[in-house]
Amino acid sequence: MGKNVVVLGTQWGDEGKGKIVDLLTQDAQVVVRYQGGHNAGHTLKINGVKTVLRLIPSGMLRPNVTCYIANGVVLSPQALLSEIKELEGNGVNVRERLRISLACPLILPYHIALDKARETHMGKSAIGTTGRGIGPAYEDKVARRALRVGDLFHRDRFANKLTELLDYHNFVLTQYFKQPAVDLESLLDESLQWVEELRPMVCDVSACLHEHRKQGENILFEGAQGVYLDIDHGTYPYVTSSNTCVGSVINGAGFGPRYIDYVLGITKAYTTRVGGGPFPTELLDDVGKRIAERGQEFGAVTGRPRRCGWFDAVLLKRSIELNSISGLCVTKLDVLDGLEVLRIAVAYKDRDGNILSRPPLAADDFNDLLPVYEELPGWQESTADVTLMSDLPANARAYLKRIEEILGIPIDMLSTGPERDSTITLRGPFL
């Protein structure tokens, strides 16, 4: 009997999911993306070669893995075809192993135009989106007016829906945001190319996944972003437009909850965040700069610098509860090498001195909170590329053990560098 494993980020994304998914695909026959879009970049480094995947599941770099983009993903045909051609240029056979749900909502040029226009209009109050049309595409989905992949293969239906939808969005673009309209005819012409390229790859993804399950194959579900970017459970409104928690597997891939065997939560040994929004443990001093430099903390898609801070156990506890996380994978432990003192946030304190053990539910409610830290000694030895727990410095092992004690959950994997082999596996999710 096969196992079904979910890998998701427990913080604000950028936790290193791509490398871990790629590593775990040695035991998987199927890898599935189930939410988000091409706003999330998963960075892989294999034999010194760096690859950034945005839409295509990380399992694509394993020759025997079938990859699915499920219905919970908002899909930009332009971005997908560009990514396919980039991988094919590097010798990866994509089209024979990639399948796309007919029910994926499409990201079209007017979504991108709206996204950028809104961010510009909001000025200093901007959310800090990637400007790739993700939010507006999900808005169309929820408003029940989205064009989906399946519509592309019915020309008259697609043209009629697009004409009506573009009238609406162009009105907003031109009249409210004072931006140029998106041209209907050029978009219709471009969509003809998408039809021919996508046709061999589309299917009913949910039905295919259940066939794989019945055949006893191992299935890996690859999450994008992180728990605190979830539209419902994140630091609203500084969130993404999709559900990033484990429940999104059920809706976003059509896969029943009782079939999930293991949930692996990915967390950095510290905390990072891109864009605006609350960040209780953020470091604005030389330590924060040092972590950012050593960790090369720049967004894989946007190149924007990431904000860096201490490990926040308050946030992690809630992530574990929300997602029934089975075990953790701690990444970038080596970035902390050489620090004299490490801190873990174990609670928050409000302006009246009250101690809070859980994070608030709205971004504004973080404003007056300060982290309550527990200090631990750092280590001077290198942890880079260590592959055995016993070879880690004593203080590094103590740091990890304390995280386990605070969170009440095991650390099953550790990443000590960007390469596949720079990993310590204590308990494999598929075992």
Curated annotation (Swiss-Prot):
Residues where substrate binds: 300-306
Catalytic residue list: 14, 42
Keywords: Cytoplasm, GTP-binding, Ligase, Magnesium, Metal-binding, Nucleotide-binding, Purine biosynthesis
NCBIfam families tied to this protein: PRK01117.1, purA
Summary of subunit composition and partner proteins: Homodimer.
HAMAP family: Adenylosucc_synth
Record-given protein name: Adenylosuccinate synthetase
Native organism: Legionella pneumophila (strain Corby)
Gene name of the record: purA
